[in-house]
């Protein structure tokens, strides 16, 4: 009976003895993965694994007893089995570390998410890839008479402002992102909609293509195009032409910062304001600020008047020949005849900055003097590029009410902080709120500062999204594995979030102000630069005619 039992046991464990390496590897792999199972998996496989473990332990026990306590010699297969068992564990560790990432990717790809789950938050890495796809098109094909074309959205569908009259528009973005493309597109449409277009560009010599776009539209509509260079030595217009004494005084006081200011320094500029009023009442028709400065400089600086500050400002403006022409362009006629004026300014020299502010202030005065009660004034579109160099109190006040006089502004700047960089006679926070409140149409290109990105993200509104929570477990091979179960919770996110605003490529912006915010791609109107477009009309050969007028020096009030 003993021999029969031994024979039965030997036959039972014979497969292991004959193939110790195969069963050793399988045993090591099986033990490793059983130990790696999580609690839920162990419960599911409890019966099967218990059976396998029982059989395995019985086999090994019998083999060990027969080898060490009987004449049956199977030590060599046992050594091979033990080595293979360890090798199986090592192979399992290596396999799990390599296979888990691949399996998780396959599971993620094949998993169909719940249809009730909302969209999640954005990933800036994926956004940059998606938004970098350029959409090429000809904007002229989409322009309509009674609507304003903005550009194509990310679905290649045109975006329009469905109003015949455009409101104030704000364009924000750093240099090189495409602000000029949107402004030139709007300017082109303003001309073909029979509006007067005035562009003031703070870049020296102006933009390379913007004047050409304006000229192209003017040629199409049979309108006059005028190019003005503030830095030129050629006399081009008289800033005081057709201006009343009150208008001249208000213009000089506002641009020269002579009025009351938040810092209280305006109290000490009373004598300068007195001289400004004196100039406004005494300047003769056809006379320029340069002429008046030359004739009355000593009078301003005298001990009786003590208006050296005003004299310095006036002397500075007198050096800008472009706005001191006794005969030249008529701003009144340009507005009345709905013509186009492109002004190339400069930002590096204070006298040119003041000249730009004077010019803009005078344009505002001419717009506001038109009758808007018994007739509807023609529309005037004023585009201000890098308009922080053109800010004055007159402009700030006009932004609130000038739409009633048939005008709208398109202002461009680089960041929200530019709006607080104002002259000393203005409050930066008040001006900031004025611009942000009255410019309901906004176009923002790539944001490079957090303040601007966060503001426009908040302005786009909020949507409900789902935040996903997953559990990560560490396996026996020290490999992290994402659990199959996940939790989804409702949260809020900006419709156009900060990641989108930071990832916008060139020629791509976010459009706000007409329904939901949209991604818009703006392509340029094709033009070729030419010297003829930038030719400046020279009025210096015209005969100077100054209307005689008696000046009463004693009457300075």
Where are these regions (language model features)?
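Generic hydrophobic alpha-helical membrane-span motif
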Residues: 73-74, 207, 420
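Short, flexible active-site loops
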Residues: 55-57, 344, 382, 438
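Basic- and hydrophobic-enriched, low-structure N-terminal and domain-boundary segments
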Residues: 1-175, 181-186, 511
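N-terminal short leaders/motifs
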Residues: 142-148, 286-293, 465-469, 475-476
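P-loop NTPase motor domains
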Residues: 2-6, 10-23, 28, 32-40, ...
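Conserved ATP-driven motor cores of ASCE-family P-loop NTPases powering translocation/secretion/packaging/pilus
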Residues: 408, 413-514
């Amino acid at each position: 009976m003993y021999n029969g039992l031994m024979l039965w046991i030997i036959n039972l464990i014979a497969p292991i003895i004959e193939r110790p390496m195969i069963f050793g590897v399988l045993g090591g792999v099986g033990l490793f993965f059983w130990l790696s199972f999580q609690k839920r998996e162990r419960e599911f496989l409890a019966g099967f694994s218990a059976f396998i473990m029982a059989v395995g332990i019985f086999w090994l026990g019998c083999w060990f007893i027969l080898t060490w306590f009987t004449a049956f010699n199977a030590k060599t297969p046992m050594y091979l089995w033990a080595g293979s068992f360890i090798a199986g564990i090592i192979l399992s560790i290596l396999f799990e570390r390599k296979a888990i990432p691949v399996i998780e990717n396959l599971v993620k790809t094949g998993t169909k998410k719940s249809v009730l789950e909302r969209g999640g938050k954005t990933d800036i890495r994926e956004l940059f890839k998606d938004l970098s796809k350029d959409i090429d098109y000809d904007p002229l094909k989409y322009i309509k008479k009674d609507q304003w074309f903005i550009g194509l959205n990310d679905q290649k569908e045109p975006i329009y402002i469905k109003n015949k009259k455009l409101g104030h528009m704000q364009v924000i973005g750093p240099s090189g992102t495409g602000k000029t493309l949107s402004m030139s597109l709007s300017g082109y449409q303003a001309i073909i909609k029979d509006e007067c277009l005035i562009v003031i560009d703070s870049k020296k010599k102006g933009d390379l293509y913007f004047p050409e776009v304006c000229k192209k539209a003017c040629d199409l509509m049979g309108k006059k195009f005028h190019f003005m260079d503030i830095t030129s030595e050629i006399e081009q217009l008289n800033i005081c032409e057709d201006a009343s004494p009150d208008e001249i005084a208000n213009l000089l006081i506002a641009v020269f910062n002579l009025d009351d200011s938040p810092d209280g320094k305006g109290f000490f500029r009373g004598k300068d304001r007195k001289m400004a009023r004196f100039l406004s009442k005494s300047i003769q028709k056809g006379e320029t600020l340069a002429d008046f400065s030359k004739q009355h400089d000593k009078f301003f600086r005298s001990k009786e008047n003590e208006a050296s500050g005003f004299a310095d400002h006036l002397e500075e403006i007198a050096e800008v020949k472009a706005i001191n022409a006794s005969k030249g362009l008529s701003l009144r006629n340009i507005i009345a005849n709905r013509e186009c004026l492109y002004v190339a300014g400069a930002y590096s020299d204070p006298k040119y900055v003041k000249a730009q502010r004077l010019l803009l202030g005078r344009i505002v005065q001419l717009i506001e003097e038109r009758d808007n009660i018994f007739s509807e004034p023609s529309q005037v579109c004023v585009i201000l590029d890098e308009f922080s160099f053109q800010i004055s109190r007159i402009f700030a006040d006009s932004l609130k009410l000038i739409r009633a006089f048939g005008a709208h502004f398109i202002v461009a700047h680089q960041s929200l902080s530019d709006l607080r960089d104002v002259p000393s006679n203005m409050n930066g926070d008040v001006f900031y709120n004025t611009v942000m409140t009255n410019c309901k149409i906004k176009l923002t290109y790539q944001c490079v500062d957090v303040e601007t990105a966060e503001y426009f993200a908040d302005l786009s509104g909020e949507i409900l999204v789902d935040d996903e929570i997953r559990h990560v477990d560490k396996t026996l091979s020290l490999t992290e594995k994402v659990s199959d179960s996940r939790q989804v919770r409702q949260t809020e996110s900006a419709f156009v979030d900060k990641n989108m605003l930071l990832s916008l490529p060139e020629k791509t912006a976010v459009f706000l102000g007409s329904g939901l915010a949209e991604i818009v791609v703006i392509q340029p109107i094709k033009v070729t630069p030419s010297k003829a477009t930038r030719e400046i009309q020279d009025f210096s050969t015209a005969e100077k005619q100054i209307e005689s007028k008696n000046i009463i020096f004693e009457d300075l009030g």
